[in-house]
């Protein structure tokens, strides 16, 4: 979901596009800018407002030029610090009221559970915002690799896809806003019975605003991961096209996937070009770009280099994308771990309140529906983080399968078998997976583990509650 830096995407004819590395001394000297448009600019604008993307936006004819802004960094720090302080003071004030007057903490156990609920939101938002400047700098660097893929395999742009993504993002934010508003109003109305409605407003306003920061952070990561997954899909499609070119059809021919399938519209801001050139346009001028595929007049993708050279370049692009995956994992490492812990705790806390409400039989239907919607929201939050990573891992497995079938189907003479052998060794050494801080792998088995842990802790909490009564 991020942008690339202002360097050329490739250099010498016949060579693959270079991949910037953290050890490259020239990487840091490049101007940290890029041009974004459409839904990409939309998610960045929202992230910037909530302190998760401290960028400056300069309007251009084809989108916005974005770069790190010191003023926005200060704004982000001040925003999250004020919200965290307000939330902590509100939590302490609510605890001091006591269980008799509190509408959210009616017992000692609910005091403990609600405190955990508030603190995990505070920690998640803090980890996301305080680490945002470094994360954005890393994004601006490694997205040059994304740009090199777009250039090499004849990427094309879909306006309809971008509109769909914008609609999905708006729908998610509207649903969450309605849920937050309903939750806030419910507790305010409950507090009105004992003339404490304004106490609820002042004590919890920071908490609810921090919830937006958490949600935007999760959407930001999902957007980024899905954009990389789209490039893996495109590399796999190019690999299948190469196989068909040498009369080894591995898959049924299908329509090429738009590389902005998740509305990633990126353009590089070159130091040597007066105008910005869209990296999603097929006709890139000049010989310095390591183009592998171009779209013919009929719209069909066409291989423009020999199959052996195409395999070599695709291996380089695949390696570049693997490096991008690892950099994303490093950039989002701490926030992802905190998000997973936060989701685990919320999946324990919310069903706990729901079950307790059912057990006391107070017949507050509104509260039951509200807690059920929060349970659904937390499950969806977990899938928002895990599913893009799962799809990316599957794309990596598809690459392995394609290379394996190519190795067993191609003739044993010439350079092609050796290129495929090198590609297969690269796949063995470079895994496609998100492992934040090396603590876990973001994949569907993690969902099963979380749900198992939730069940175990819910049983323990309910037993403690019954014992206390």
Predicted ranges, named:
Residues 403-424:
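Juxtamembrane non-transmembrane "cap" segments at the membrane-aqueous interface
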Residues 2-394, 428-469:
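Membrane-embedded alpha-helical segments and the immediately adjacent membrane-proximal loops
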Residues 390, 394-397, 401-404, 418, ...:
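A generic structural signal for well-ordered alpha-helical surface patches
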Residues 151-154, 244, 399-409:
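Membrane-cytosol interface motif
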């Amino acid at each position: 979901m991020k942008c690339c830096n202002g360097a050329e995407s490739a250099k010498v004819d016949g060579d693959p596009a270079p991949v910037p590395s953290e050890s490259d001394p020239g990487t840091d000297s490049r101007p940290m800018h890029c041009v974004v448009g459409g839904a990409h600019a939309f998610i960045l604008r929202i992230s910037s407002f909530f302190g998760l993307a401290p960028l400056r936006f300069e309007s251009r004819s084809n989108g916005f030029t974005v770069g790190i802004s010191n003023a926005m960094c200060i704004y982000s720090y001040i925003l999250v610090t004020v919200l965290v302080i307000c939330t902590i003071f509100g939590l302490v004030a609510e605890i001091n009221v006591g269980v008799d007057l509190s509408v959210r903490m009616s017992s000692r156990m609910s005091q403990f559970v609600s405190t955990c609920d508030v603190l995990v939101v505070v920690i998640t938002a803090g980890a996301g915002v305080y680490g945002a400047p470094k994360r954005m700098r890393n994004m601006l660097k490694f997205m040059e690799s994304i740009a090199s893929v777009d250039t090499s395999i004849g990427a094309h742009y879909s306006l309809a896809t971008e509109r769909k993504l914008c609609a999905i993002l708006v729908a998610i934010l509207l649903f969450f806003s309605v849920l937050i508003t309903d939750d806030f109003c419910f507790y305010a109305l409950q507090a009105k019975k004992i003339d404490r409605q304004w106490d609820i407003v002042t004590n919890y306003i920071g908490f609810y605003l921090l919830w937006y920061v958490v949600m935007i952070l999760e959407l930001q990561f999902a957007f980024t991961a899905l954009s990389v997954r789209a490039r893996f899909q495109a590399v796999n499609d190019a690999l299948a096209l190469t196989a068909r070119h040498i009369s080894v059809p591995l898959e049924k021919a299908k329509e090429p996937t738009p590389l902005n399938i998740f509305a990633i519209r990126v353009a590089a801001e070159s130091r040597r070009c007066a105008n910005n050139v869209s990296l999603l346009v097929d006709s890139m001028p000049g010989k310095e770009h390591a183009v592998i595929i171009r779209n013919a007049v009929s719209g069909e993708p066409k291989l423009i280099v020999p199959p052996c050279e195409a395999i070599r370049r695709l291996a380089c692009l695949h390696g570049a994308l693997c490096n991008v995956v690892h950099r994303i994992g490093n950039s989002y490492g701490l926030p992802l771990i905190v998000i997973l812990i936060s989701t685990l705790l919320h999946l324990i806390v919310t069903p706990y309140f729901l079950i307790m409400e059912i057990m006391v039989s107070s017949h507050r239907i509104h509260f039951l529906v509200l807690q059920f919607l929060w349970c659904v929201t937390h499950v969806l939050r977990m899938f928002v983080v895990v599913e893009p990573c799962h799809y990316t891992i599957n794309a990596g497995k598809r690459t392995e399968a394609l290379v394996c079938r190519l190795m067993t189907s191609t003739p044993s003479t010439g350079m092609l078998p050796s290129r495929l052998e090198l590609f297969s060794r690269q796949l063995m050494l470079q895994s496609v997976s998100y492992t934040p801080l090396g603590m876990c792998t973001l994949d569907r088995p993690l969902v099963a583990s979380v749900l198992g842990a939730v069940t175990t802790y819910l049983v323990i909490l309910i037993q403690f509650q019954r014992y206390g009564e």
